[in-house]
Amino acid sequence: MNIDKLREEIASDEGRRNAVYLCSLQKRTVGIGHLITADDPEWPMEVGDTISDERIDELFDSDIAVTIDDCRIIFDDFDAFPEPAQLCLANMCYQLGRPTFSKFKRSIAYANDHNWGDLAEEIL
């Protein structure tokens, strides 16, 4: 999978924000859709506080790596999927996170069966 293409797609979908904001779930988020957790040094930051461009890049690099690892956990043979499927599924995993994305049992089964037509219908 072309990681640069994945990064471009996710950055385009998410946007890039130096200031902490509330996502649609009213959780503090920063950078390129990075959900702030208690493990992050940004944890004490409030909405409107800012981080550097360098920190955004660090968070994004880490989040992309986690997303790809998560896809390899969720799907039997993720690396053998066609690139369009990899990009789509990785983007979904990035947006939703592994715990939520793992609940899409039919979608996961279709992907593992390489049933791309039914997968496309399921996720649209």
Tell me what each language-model feature is:
Residues M1-I3, P41, P82:
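Short, structured coil/loop segments at alpha-helix boundaries
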Residues Y21-V47, P84-A85:
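Short, surface-exposed glycine/acidic/tryptophan-bearing loops
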Residues W43-F75, E83-F101:
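Alpha-helical segment that forms one wall of the substrate-binding/catalytic cleft
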Residues T29-G31, C88-N91, D118-L119:
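Structural recognition of the beta-strand scaffold that forms the well-ordered cores
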Residues N18-Y21, I73-A85, R106, E122:
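Surface-exposed patches in mature extracellular/periplasmic domains of secreted proteins
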Residues M1-R17, L25-Q26, H34-I36, I51, ...:
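Long, amphipathic alpha-helical surface segments
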